[in-house]
């Protein structure tokens, strides 16, 4: 008879390194990363708005309030996915959507809720581009602006080896434009159940017998932790039978 710790040591010493494989990003959930993932780009890639609203120069809306709104001329509409075409000058603004690039000349965004373009009753905004707007609140420089590289900088390691890939990790990798990931192969693990008292689950119980339940528990645990279980049945309580199965 050997101790549990010695048995674990013997088993561990017999294991070989798990191979590495490349898998598509769509099949990488739950897999274990084998090497660093480094970003080649900044995220965001461009300075953009974090709110639907109006891109402004901070100095133009200084002192704006409910009783003393600032009036700005609207010179452009910038939905998400469009590149700005105008430089915003004094007392000018551009309507901008969340995620859209900031135009040249501005340094903040006023949320649409702080302008006369927001209908508080319907909690919506007009799709028509106004010629001018009223701004009811001042903002500080950088307000509602996401800067280049604010989340991830080019050259930054975003995921390290031996980490299990979660859904949010795959989303991040997709944002970096990476379609293939290097992961460890899933280890194949053989399961035997030992015991003269065991019966397969589809066989009716007899006196002194029990169903083989551990095989299903172990298979589920192995699958959950990333392995590939393979159940090879029940082995009787005989040394020769156990050795032969191994």
Model-based region annotation:
Residues 1-66, 95, 107, 126:
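Short, low-complexity N-terminal leaders and the immediately following helix N-cap/first helix
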Residues 235-246:
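Structural motif
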Residues 8, 29, 116, 171, ...:
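Generic structural signal for individual residues within well-ordered alpha-helical segments
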Residues 2, 55-231, 236:
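Short, glycine/charged-enriched hinge/interface segments at domain edges or termini
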Residues 31-36, 145, 241-242:
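Short, solvent-exposed polar/charged micro-motifs at secondary-structure junctions
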């Amino acid at each position: 008879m050997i101790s549990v710790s010695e048995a674990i040591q013997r088993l561990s010493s017999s294991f070989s390194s798990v191979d590495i494989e490349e898998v598509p990003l769509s099949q990488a959930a739950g897999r274990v990363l084998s090497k660093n993932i480094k970003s080649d780009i900044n995220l965001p890639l461009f300075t953009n708005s974090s709110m639907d609203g109006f891109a402004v120069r901070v100095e133009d809306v200084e002192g704006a309030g409910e009783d003393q709104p600032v009036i700005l001329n609207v010179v452009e509409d910038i939905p998400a996915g469009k590149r700005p075409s105008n430089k915003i000058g004094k007392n000018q603004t551009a309507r901008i959507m969340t995620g859209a690039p900031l135009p040249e000349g501005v340094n903040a965004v006023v949320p649409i809720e702080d302008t006369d373009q927001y209908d508080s009753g319907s909690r919506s905004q007009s799709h028509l581009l106004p010629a001018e707007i009223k701004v009811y609140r001042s903002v500080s420089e950088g307000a509602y602006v996401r800067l280049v590289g604010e989340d991830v900088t080019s050259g930054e390691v975003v995921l390290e080896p031996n980490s299990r890939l979660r859904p949010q990790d795959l989303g991040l990798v997709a944002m970096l434009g990476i379609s293939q990931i290097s992961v460890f192969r899933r280890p194949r693990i053989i399961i035997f159940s030992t015991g003269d008292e065991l019966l397969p689950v589809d066989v009716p119980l007899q006196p002194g017998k029990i169903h083989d339940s551990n095989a299903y528990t172990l298979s589920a645990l192995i699958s959950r932790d990333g392995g590939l279980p393979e159940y090879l049945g029940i082995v009787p309580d005989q040394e020769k039978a156990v050795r032969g199965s191994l």
